[in-house]
Amino acid sequence: DIDRKDLREAADYFGNYLQFHRLKHRLAQSSRTLQKTPVPIAEYTFSDTKEHFAADDVRTLMLAEGDSGLVGDLLKKRPADLLVCDLPYGVQHAPQNGKKAESFPKLLERILPAWRRALKPGGAAAISFNTLTLRKDTLLTLLQNAGFTLLTEPPYDDFSHFVEQAVHRDFIVARNEQP
């Protein structure tokens, strides 16, 4: 995400969730510089029990603020099992370098290869989006062109639902089968 407020709210929400459910966890906040751009990171390490946490039987959730096209570099040494994305519902997508805003399909064409590189082989990207601003067939084609394997059979084929007047949400899961 590029909105620092959204990153902080998501990190706070997840921290509150972990506390409410009494899950052992640790928050590490840091920043990395990628292509001369600072990328603030909030990383939660958590487990279901103190014993599992002590034995390093943990899961990690990383929230990062910045250009999504840098995620391949960000996760180069520790690729992810899962990338989760709720695409914007129709706003301008201006790059941080001050250049002209990219069209949404052009933005995705640029960043999807980085998402695939950020995933372990067998890892998946789970993407929700507004079908009124981005057609499902367009997103499927962009994902396929970026080297993803599309999961289109049940139970992955019927997530489409009405949210409100300007939002009709759908959901796609795509796997990285490449090493």
Give residue spans per PLM region.
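Class I S-adenosyl-L-methionine-dependent methyltransferase catalytic core
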Residues: 1-179
